[in-house]
Amino acid sequence: MKSAVENLEPTRVKLTVEVAFDELKASLDHAYQHIAQQVNVPGFRKGKVPPRVIDQRVGRAAVVEHAVNDALPDFYRQAVTESELKVLGQPEVEVTGVPDTTSGELTFTAEVDVRPDFTLPALADLELEVDDVAVTDDDVAERLDLLRQRYGTLTGVDRAAETGDYVVIDMTATIDGEEVDTVSGVSYEIGSGNMLDGLDEALVGLAADETATFSAPLAGGDRAGEAADVSVTVTAVKVQELPEADDDFAQLASEFDTLEELQADLRTQISDAKVNNQAVQARDRLLEKLVEATDFPLPQGVIEAEIHRHLESEGRLEDDEHREEVREEATQALRRQLVLDVLADQVSVQVNQNELVEFLLRTAQQYRVDPNEFITNADKTGQIPSFVAELARNKSLAVALRDVRVVDASGNAVDLTSFIGSEETDAEDAAEGVESVEVDLSAAAEDDAEETSDEPAAEDTATEDEAAKA
């Protein structure tokens, strides 16, 4: 097989591939076997029809066509690998030459989007700032109040409602005089803002058995987003009474005998949470800094395909305003993905078998499916490379943070080793025989984009199987 690459744009190339007739032999043999299973020929059992009879009954040309369709995806992938292309999405394939029944070459072209070339800034030159981990008395008091609220009781009061009160309400929503929704006996904390826009303002000042009206877009149902006239009636006003913060409460709400012990434990919990948050902040801020520091063209075909997939899934293909919102999201998501792909290459990320298995088990649990069934299906549908690539992208940030200076708001160096590992821990994994999984970000990017394809079926054969995003 011979192949050549022509650069059409910074993010798009044209592959020209030539395949000698002899290289189609395996596909021709497979074509004969497949056709033998499909045809009924008197005197022969299914699957046992010899090639010469198939040539007579079906035609050698049909066998060659079957072989070409079967072989083309593999030859395309081989050409991509040999040319060291980082492809994104599906190719547009055009078969330009088909061998005759006994000789000739298979020739085809494939135009495909590719990852642009760009360089990331030197990691050793970067400095990231994260929050301090010092725990204040106010932090402990706030956490203690949250715990007290879990054990609080609601008591009715005979006065107008205020922010922070709990009210029991009945609501009716109408559009053009037609009742579209109604609820009754709902308990709501004024100021929480987790129901309709304008509800908090309408409730403040209402006493039991008083009613107010306001307008707001509906938050759910068949008429979601439409403006409605809402009538709300308060049937009860209640305040939350919290238990005293004392030793008795400590014994009620925890395993500790004294309030002092409970407060010490809360302080430890808060400190641990802040340390964890430092690692999250460092990861997010590293990605943000790398994206800001790089400028590169994006393949618009990949972005348009993602926009179409997103809008189609929501049934909003004609919503131009939402299209622009999705375009911005898709553009930023692709930019982050490409930065992570380059970073994974730069720091030579390895995903081991244990990490992959843990990820698959977590994902199966997330979707509430049997782990064995999920893993089997993922392998059968070709999703494993995408999962490995996603793990590699995430892991690349942790590995890269080893070379970046991280400080807290007070200027103190922050040690994230317990979260990001080290070369020593990597060596220990290798010594224990933890097998690494091959990371192919190019194939995974092709898989991810296949979901968005609108190409004809004949061209679909030139790509990997569809892969889900995890």
Swiss-Prot record:
One of its GO terms (cellular component) is cytoplasm. It comes from the Bacteria. This is Trigger factor. It is an enzyme of class 5 (isomerase). Consists of 3 domains; the N-terminus binds the ribosome, the middle domain has PPIase activity, while the C-terminus has intrinsic chaperone activity on its own. Its main location: cytoplasm. Its EC number is 5.2.1.8. It catalyses: [protein]-peptidylproline (omega=180) = [protein]-peptidylproline (omega=0).
